[in-house]
Amino acid sequence: MKKIKLQELKDSEILEQLEEARKVLRNSRFQYGVARSLENPKIISNTKKKIAKLLTIQRERQLKANPGERKSRVFSRAKRKKKNLARLSAKAKG
């Protein structure tokens, strides 16, 4: 499916598509790894791309619903970095 069509899906439909794609990926990897009976190995990479698209759409909707969430993630990352630098400089002194 194209990304435009995927964006038109409801949240529940995205979850269903995601679950279905993960099942297909699991079965394809099994067939390719164990039995070597997979007719088209490209199915694996295409399915992984579809899962990535679905997860991206899901995350975009999550950020639209909570616009402040992204800022808090960036802030906490900077805060951790500052804390780690302080800890490393304290080790170097002591």
Swiss-Prot record:
Record-linked Gene3D superfamilies: 1.10.287.310
Tagged with keyword Ribonucleoprotein: yes
Source superkingdom: Bacteria
An example Gene Ontology molecular-function term: structural constituent of ribosome
InterPro entries (UniProt xref): Ribosomal_protein_uL29, Ribosomal_uL29, Ribosomal_uL29_sf
GO biological process, one term: translation
Keywords, sorted A to Z: Ribonucleoprotein, Ribosomal protein
Pfam family, one: Ribosomal_L29
Compositionally biased intervals (Basic residues): 73-94
One Gene Ontology CC term in the entry: cytosolic large ribosomal subunit
Region of interest: Disordered: 65-94
PANTHER family hit by this protein: 60S RIBOSOMAL PROTEIN L35/50S RIBOSOMAL PROTEIN L29, LARGE RIBOSOMAL SUBUNIT PROTEIN UL29C
Family the entry assigns: Belongs to the universal ribosomal protein uL29 family.
NCBIfam families with a match to the protein in the record: L29
The protein, known as: Large ribosomal subunit protein uL29
Gene giving rise to this polypeptide: rpmC
